[in-house]
Amino acid sequence: MNIKIIPCEKTHIEDAIELAYLSWQPIYDYYRETLGEKMFDILYKDWKEQKRQRIYNGLTSGRGYIALADGQPAGFIFYVIDDAKKVGAVEENAVNPKFRGLGIAQKMYDFVFDKIRQEGMVCAMVSTGLDEAHAPARRAYEKAGFDRSLESVRYYREL
């Protein structure tokens, strides 16, 4: 299979947004189950619209890329730069489930690491959750060479 990473074009955005919905649905299902319906609705009721905006903004930022597998959109990735700290952060990324296991995620990370280096950064970072819904992301990031982490927890309560 021929894998190619290219700058995102407008024609790829809707496919990437649909992939984001597919990829993040289990995470938001977990949030709903954990937080309960009321708290979930307060915090994440419009998660799809927020995700749509985030994906659109990231992919059209000039730092957004699409992975093509034999010409078909198979994944996306975008990053941001913190010039002051010299850190590049992978913001969002996903691989279509039908293309998983082909090394596409690793190719996207390597591609973005090169871009981040070219922009003069000395460190790359990514954030993800510690819950089971984020376990595949954690495995992918560790495989990509992210070898240090700071754990965190976010608490909520009703008032």
Where are these regions (language model features)?
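Extreme N-terminal starter segment of soluble prokaryotic enzymes
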Residues: 2-4
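Acetyl-CoA-dependent GNAT
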Residues: 7-87, 91, 96, 109, ...
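Structural preference for beta-strand elements that scaffold enzyme active sites
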Residues: 87, 123-125
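Conserved beta-strand-loop-alpha-helix junction that forms the acyl-donor binding cleft
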Residues: 100, 125-137, 156-159
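Short polybasic/polar patches that bind polyanions
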Residues: 100, 117, 142
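Conserved G/P- and acidic residue-centered "switch" motifs that form tight phosphate/ATP-binding loops
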Residues: 103
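Conserved active-site alpha-helix within GNAT-family acetyltransferase domains
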Residues: 106, 130-150
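Conserved acyl-CoA
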Residues: 107-123, 147
